[in-house]
């Protein structure tokens, strides 16, 4: 009857969820090392956020005052960068197309004589076949 769940004490139930052995030395060392490091990095992140907000609060009036100059300048720079990138992309596309075309022509030049010989043989065979057929028909007409 002691095995039934309602007969167990609450401390026994809690102990059943806990691991039987404690953390290893390397795990404890990792926590001891990384916890302060994480805290320091979190503090630095907070300081940087605070500095950014203060800097933005100070610089916002300057951005508002100089916005008639800054906005067109930013747009001009953005368009110039876009133009350079587009030009480069088109240049690379053109070079790769020319390279492909040259390789294609080189491959075709090597196989062109073979293709011409094959076409010549087919024409000769076709002409020879037609000549034989015409000769056969003429002999059939002559022999009644």
UniProtKB/Swiss-Prot annotation:
The proline-knot motif may be involved in the targeting to oil bodies. May have a structural role to stabilize the lipid body during desiccation of the seed by preventing coalescence of the oil. Probably interacts with both lipid and phospholipid moieties of lipid bodies. May also provide recognition signals for specific lipase anchorage in lipolysis during seedling growth. Belongs to the oleosin family. Expressed in seeds (at protein level). It holds the Pfam family Oleosin. It is a multi-pass membrane protein. The chain crosses the membrane at residues 28-48, 53-73, 75-95. Keywords: Acetylation, Lipid droplet, Membrane, Transmembrane, Transmembrane helix. GO terms for cellular component: membrane; monolayer-surrounded lipid storage body. This is Oleosin H2. GO terms for biological process: lipid droplet organization; lipid storage; response to freezing; seed maturation; seed oilbody biogenesis. It comes from Sesamum indicum (Oriental sesame). Residues 124-144 are annotated as: Disordered. It is found in: Lipid droplet; Membrane. The modification N-acetylalanine is found at residue 2. A motif (Proline-knot) lies at residues 61-72.
């Amino acid at each position: 009857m002691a095995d039934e769940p309602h007969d167990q004490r609450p401390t026994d139930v809690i102990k059943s969820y806990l691991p039987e052995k404690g953390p290893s030395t390397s795990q404890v060392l990792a926590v001891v090392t990384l916890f302060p490091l994480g805290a320091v990095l979190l503090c630095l992140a907070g300081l940087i956020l605070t500095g950014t907000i203060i800097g933005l609060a100070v610089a916002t009036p300057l951005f508002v005052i100089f916005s008639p100059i800054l906005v067109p300048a930013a747009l001009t720079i953005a368009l110039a960068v876009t133009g350079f990138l587009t030009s480069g992309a088109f240049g690379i596309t053109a070079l790769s197309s020319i390279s492909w075309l040259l390789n294609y022509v080189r491959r075709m030049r090597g196989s062109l004589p073979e293709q011409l010989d094959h076409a010549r043989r087919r024409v000769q065979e076709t002409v020879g076949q037609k000549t034989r057929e015409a000769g056969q028909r003429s002999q059939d007409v002559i022999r009644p």
